[in-house]
């Protein structure tokens, strides 16, 4: 159980206007507009996020997809999480349908697509590669390594990384991966060795940018000292605030690292389309293992959804759109990656870029949320064992 009430010594934060998934399951958990600016390459070191206004927020609103930077990688302000198309939120989608959704996202201005070797496993990378091949040079692909899919467990040994990247490149039908994340920090391999292996792959042109998923602030600093980290991917949403409390967001801001929230609509819960009667098949849906998705927690957390619904009515929007707009309003270097296999849900998600939350809106949302309690852990105990705690 997580309480959201502020520390008595800390005043409520005012959000200024942003004028935006055993072992395989553990591995898989990571994570409307038209033209966007061209993608930027380069891996130069940077210190501090400088693409910001004095209060670290940027203008938001309108129907045109804007561009944000993850380190030196320029991407659309909303990305596309491709895991759920192939695995982990029910049976895999029809391949034709999955490709159509990915391509529709690109047509609507999305240039950032997220996958991983473990999703499926392998089938997500294959689907993404096929879907994006016709316009590969107009998009950025993020994928992930870090699990031993034959022996089981974590494996970030440099020689393993340099082997699996070749397989991912083939499945993705490309000669380079724009952003390559360590999926989970391997306690048996120094992060400096991991960063060094990625540095070698960057020199070879096979990887363009380095990322970490579910890493602690300490690990981020150690990795960044060897090879610039472009992005951190961690669960973060209106109801899941760990990155605000554990120093990860602050470290990203200090070091000029972008942040990519996975599960930005609470694995579907914040859409308001599931209630205490929702059930999840343990054979195909990771949420069946999570206490936050038990009938008891689903009912207990409903006030959070009601809060978003009330706000959505005022803004002529949906709860999902408010949740995404809230994330986009936090920092100009945050890029949420909502995922869906449903075309209507895709359009709904992308509609979030037209929702403008004022300073008063953000303060009201924060004040109301601070009176609520989030029930149930974000993942099961066995999944949390693979999350880096920085010790």
Show the residue positions of the predicted features.
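N-terminal secretory signal peptides
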Residues: 1-18
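N-terminal small/glycine-rich loop or linker at the start of catalytic domains
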Residues: 71-89, 142-152
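Structural preference for beta-strand elements that scaffold enzyme active sites
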Residues: 75-79, 112, 138-142, 176-179, ...
């Amino acid at each position: 159980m997580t309480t959201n009430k502020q520390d008595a010594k800390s005043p409520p934060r005012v959000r200024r206007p942003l004028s935006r998934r055993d072992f395989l399951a553990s591995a898989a958990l990571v994570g409307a507009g038209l033209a966007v600016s061209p993608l930027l390459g380069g891996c130069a070191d940077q210190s501090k996020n400088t693409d910001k206004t004095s209060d670290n927020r940027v203008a938001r609103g309108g129907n045109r997809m804007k561009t944000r930077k993850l380190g030196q990688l320029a991407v659309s302000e909303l990305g596309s999480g491709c895991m759920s198309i192939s695995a982990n939120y029910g049976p895999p989608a029809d391949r034709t349908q999955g490709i159509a959704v990915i391509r529709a996202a690109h047509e609507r201005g999305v240039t950032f697509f997220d996958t991983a070797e473990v999703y499926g496993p392998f089938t997500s990378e294959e689907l993404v590669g096929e879907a994006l091949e016709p316009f590969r040079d107009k998009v950025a692909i993020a994928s992930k390594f870090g699990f031993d899919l034959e022996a089981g467990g974590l494996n970030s040994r440099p020689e393993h990384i340099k082997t699996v990247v070749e397989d991912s490149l083939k499945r993705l039908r490309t000669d380079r991966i724009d952003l390559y994340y360590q999926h989970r920090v391997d306690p048996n391999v120094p992060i400096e060795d991991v960063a060094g292996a990625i540095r070698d792959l960057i020199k070879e042109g096979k990887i363009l940018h380095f990322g970490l998923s579910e890493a602690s602030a300490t690990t981020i600093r150690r990795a960044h000292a060897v090879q610039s980290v472009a992005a951190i991917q961690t669960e973060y949403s209106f109801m899941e605030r760990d990155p605000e409390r554990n120093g990860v967001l602050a470290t990203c801001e200090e070091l000029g690292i972008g942040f990519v929230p996975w599960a930005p609509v609470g694995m579907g819960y914040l859409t308001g389309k599931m209630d205490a009667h929702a059930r999840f098949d343990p054979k195909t849906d990771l949420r069946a293992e999570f206490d936050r998705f038990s009938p008891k927690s689903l009912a207990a957390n409903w006030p959070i959804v009601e809060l978003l619904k009330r706000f959505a009515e005022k803004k002529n929007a949906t709860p999902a759109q408010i949740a995404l707009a809230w994330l986009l309003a936090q920092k100009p270097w945050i890029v949420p990656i909502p995922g869906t296999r449903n075309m209507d849900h895709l359009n709904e998600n992308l509609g979030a870029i037209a929702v403008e939350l004022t300073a008063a809106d953000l303060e009201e949302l924060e004040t109301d949320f601070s009176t609520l309690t989030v029930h149930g852990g974000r993942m099961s105990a066995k999944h949390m064992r693979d999350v880096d705690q920085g010790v």
